[in-house]
Amino acid sequence: MSGGSSCSQTPSRAIPATRRVVLGDGVQLPPGDYSTTPGGTLFSTTPGGTRIIYDRKFLMECRNSPVTKTPPRDLPTIPGVTSPSSDEPPMEASQSHLRNSPEDKRAGGEESQFEMDI
């Protein structure tokens, strides 16, 4: 059995230099998924431990990109979440809410979970 092992080498590349970004006090920071260094650099960490370092100019360009203003395809319609909610609730929902008051439930034989005699 001749098991010739073929080993291929990948070309080496230089590690990209990190740039520090100083954020002004008036700039809102991104969500809590990101971390900052004392110098103001934004970074996140992948589950494998790789650090992804973001530069402020790139983030600001992404923020104003037309892609960020375009919703994803096949997004379900969820009022108030993926589409604006209507100003007035439907009449049936508001009337059913009034009919299902706590007093009606107790009268129907359903008691509260915690009952206490003082």
Swiss-Prot record:
Keyword list, A-Z: Acetylation, Cytoplasm, Isopeptide bond, Nucleus, Phosphoprotein, Protein synthesis inhibitor, Translation regulation, Ubl conjugation
> Known consequence of changing residue 37 to A?
Abolishes phosphorylation by MTOR and increased ubiquitination by the BCR(KLHL25) complex
Subcellular location as annotated: Cytoplasm; Nucleus
Write out the GO biological process terms: G1/S transition of mitotic cell cycle; negative regulation of translation; negative regulation of translational initiation; positive regulation of mitotic cell cycle; TOR signaling
| Phenotype for residue 46 to A | Abolishes phosphorylation by MTOR and increased ubiquitination by the BCR(KLHL25) complex
Q: Which residues carry this modification: Phosphothreonine?
A: 37, 41, 46, 50, 70, 77
Q: Where is this region: Disordered?
A: 1-20, 25-48, 64-118
Recorded hits in InterPro entries, A to Z, give:
EIF4EBP
Mutation: residue 105 to R; reported impact is:
Does not affect ubiquitination by the BCR(KLHL25) complex
Q: What is known of its domains?
A: The TOS motif mediates interaction with RPTOR, leading to promote phosphorylation by mTORC1 complex.
Descriptive protein name: Eukaryotic translation initiation factor 4E-binding protein 1
- Protein species of origin: Homo sapiens (Human)
